[in-house]
Amino acid sequence: MNLRRDAPKTGVPTERWVALLGHRDFPTDGVEDYCRYLGEALALQGVLLRIARVDWMGEGWLRALWKLRLERAGWNSSWILMQYTALAWSRRGFPFGALLVLGILRRQGLRCAVVYHEPIALKGAGLIGGIRTACQRWILRELHRQSDMSVMTAPTRTIDWLPQEDSKAVFIPIGPNIPAPPAANGDGAAKNGKPLTVAVYCVDPPPYRERELQDIAGAVLPAAKQGTPLRILFFGKGTVDAKDEIEQTFHQTGIEVSILGLLEPGKLQQSLLESDALLSVRGAVYLRRGTAIAGVACGLPIVGYADETDIFPLSEAGLRLVPRGDQPALARALADVLRDPNLREDLRARSRRAHRSIFAWDVIAKSFQEALTKPRALG
């Protein structure tokens, strides 16, 4: 795959920006997808976004930094949007490389913004985990201090290391990792008599897999026992590996099961558009969960767990969340959505509105332009 891609051109761009990424994640890279969709939206607004990488893992730090010094010669008038996750810049979660790269760019006089895909340090257990967490918090603060602008993917008020009302930090939510959906996507399954479809994204590896499958079964079986014809779509990482456990869990339940594995974005979009609800049991639903944003973009009701985390503006979408671990409440919430077409359509409408006004890529691209031309606090 070409690691440097230009967004589609629509005439002569008025500005040229660079999205700078670290190590590529496998088998899919959500940050690269984010930059690609952002670039497509920016192109329609006159900004050409070029994607570049510091491939320190494949080439070693010395060679990767040398190539960066050569490539950055053409970036003098550009905004550099450095994409931060801890493991994109470090093998073991000590991302000093991100600071090194930012320092090189700043010493060359380039305008640099850091896009925080992980604006909070990852929590770790034990002595090493505690040191790693403290290290990441320090690096997060230093990246913010040394950059010209910080773009947070969570509301700034929820980030405890960030000074309140910091004028250099802005909140811009992530967008969906799928192509733009049709303007109208109704409740197709209910109209053509097919079973109602519940989409489930990803299944974690053991030891979490058994609990997740128990939660999924506990949520859908009561609705099936009430006579609702059901189909479950399993897609994403881990679903093929869990094929035997999934089939055993739903054997002789009368529920149709499809295990799709990893899907390219267009097929993922189509699968979501054909679904009637998205069920999320891999922890609490939170603002930076790309699957939830994709579900919102496709106008889906989202049923899942919640904790005390502030998830605004995702809370504006069609969510039915219950306390984390409350399996009976999860089953009731899903049954309500599947049984009541009026409720389902109301939740669909809320998700569609939230997508149009908050999570659509054209809205996000406009927010970037406003932030980088007239800095102001949005969180």
Regions found by a protein language model. Give the residues of each.
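Nucleotide-activated donor-binding/catalytic signature segment of Leloir-type glycosyltransferases, i.e.
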Residues: 243-269
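Donor nucleotide-sugar binding/catalytic pocket of nucleotide-sugar-dependent glycosyltransferases
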Residues: 141-184, 191-193, 200-203
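Membrane-proximal helix-turn-helix segments that form the acceptor-binding/catalytic region
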Residues: 99-111, 130-150
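A charged, aromatic-enriched C-terminal amphipathic alpha-helix characteristic of glycosyltransferases
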Residues: 30, 339-372
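Conserved catalytic-core segment of nucleotide-activated headgroup transferases in glycan assembly
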Residues: 190-246
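Acidic donor-binding loop of glycosyltransferase active sites
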Residues: 272-287, 300
